[in-house]
């Protein structure tokens, strides 16, 4: 597995393909779509008070030989933010409990995956980088990081806030019948619905 841009290109050349190069381009295209960076120009100094950090590509091969590259920030170079950096993760045990309760009460389960989830949230950390190899036209540019890039200390928290606020918006503005479809008159309707808004505020 390559450890950096140079090794990725060398491995592509050895294998006679461009899989890692293409994965890098796709990753950078997605950052352009999300407006992750704001360029101050090539060779420009960083903003006063902002911390200069490093970023690097992380390489992986997923199922069906799908090559994936993720741009990760060196968050260890920054000070610990004042606000909490904790963000919970789903435990298999908790997932099993949810499936059990759904089956017990004849409820439908729905699942979704948010691609590039962290990039949906904006970071509050004042950090910038210098675009390196693999950044294309932005190589050598001073780039302010606007989005919750993987590796930043508070990115998990920022995404958690973004997701919770989105769910709360749905609860407040979606028609009530959509939220309670199939549950009217049941114990689930009577016990869960009144607590929905309060629960989401705690997320």
Predicted ranges, named:
Residues 1-165, 169-176:
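Chromodomain-type histone methyl-lysine reader module
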Residues 162-203:
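Active-site palm subdomain of RNA-directed nucleic acid polymerases
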């Amino acid at each position: 597995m390559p450890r950096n841009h140079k090794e990725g290109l060398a491995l592509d050349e050895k294998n006679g393909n461009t899989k890692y190069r293409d994965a890098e381009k796709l990753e950078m295209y997605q950052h352009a779509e999300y407006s992750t960076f704001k360029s101050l120009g090539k060779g420009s100094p960083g903003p006063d008070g902002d911390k200069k950090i490093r970023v690097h590509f992380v390489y992986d091969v997923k199922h069906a030989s799908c090559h994936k590259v993720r741009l990760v920030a060196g968050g260890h170079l920054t000070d610990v933010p004042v606000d909490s950096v904790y963000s919970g993760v789903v435990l298999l045990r908790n997932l099993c409990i949810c499936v059990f309760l759904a089956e017990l009460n004849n409820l439908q389960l729905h699942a979704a995956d948010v691609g590039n989830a962290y990039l949906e949230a904006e970071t509050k950390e004042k950090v910038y980088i210098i675009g390196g190899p693999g950044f294309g036209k932005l190589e050598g540019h001073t780039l302010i990081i606007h989005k919750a890039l993987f590796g930043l200390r508070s990115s998990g928290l920022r995404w958690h806030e973004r997701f919770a606020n989105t769910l709360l918006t749905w609860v407040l503005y979606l028609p009530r019948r959509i939220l309670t479809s199939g549950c009217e008159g049941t114990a689930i309707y009577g016990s869960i619905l009144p607590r929905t808004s309060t629960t989401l505020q705690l997320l």
